[in-house]
Amino acid sequence: MFGLGGQPQLSSQQKIAAAEAELDLVTDMFNKLVSNCHRKCIDMNYNEGDLNKNESNCLDRCVAKYFETNVKVGENMQQLGQNFSPGKF
């Protein structure tokens, strides 16, 4: 609790700020995913109301790669954070 090596207690305001920051990151990632995969996979001349098979397959692969990359980057960042200590340079 008080300096016993545990996690510091966050105030309600800090928790709200952290949740808002996380929501902003998730929203930004989603918007980038939609923009990038749409630009890559969907022809700008809309001829049909539905996706064709090639567009659908491309979107599936694009989204899967985007999430896979996001997971790998997160794992690497977490590992870097664990390897870093104040006395280590």
Swiss-Prot record:
Entry-linked Pfam families:
zf-Tim10_DDP
An example GO BP is: protein insertion into mitochondrial inner membrane
Q: List the disulfide bonds.
A: C37-C62, C41-C58
Q: Does the keyword Zinc apply?
A: yes
Q: Does the keyword NAD apply?
A: no
A single Gene Ontology MF term assigned here is: metal ion binding
Q: Keywords on this record?
A: Chaperone, Disulfide bond, Membrane, Metal-binding, Mitochondrion, Mitochondrion inner membrane, Protein transport, Translocation, Transport, Zinc
Share what the entry says about its subunit structure, partners included: Heterohexamer; composed of 3 copies of TIM9 and 3 copies of TIM10, named soluble 70 kDa complex. Associates directly with the TIM22 complex, whose core is composed of TIM22 and TIM54. Interacts with the transmembrane regions of multi-pass transmembrane proteins in transit.
Q: Describe its function.
A: Mitochondrial intermembrane chaperone that participates in the import and insertion of multi-pass transmembrane proteins into the mitochondrial inner membrane. Also required for the transfer of beta-barrel precursors from the TOM complex to the sorting and assembly machinery (SAM complex) of the outer membrane. Acts as a chaperone-like protein that protects the hydrophobic precursors from aggregation and guide them through the mitochondrial intermembrane space.
The Swiss-Prot or TrEMBL record describes its family as follows: Belongs to the small Tim family.
Please give the name of this protein.
Mitochondrial import inner membrane translocase subunit TIM10
- Gene encoding this polypeptide? TIM10
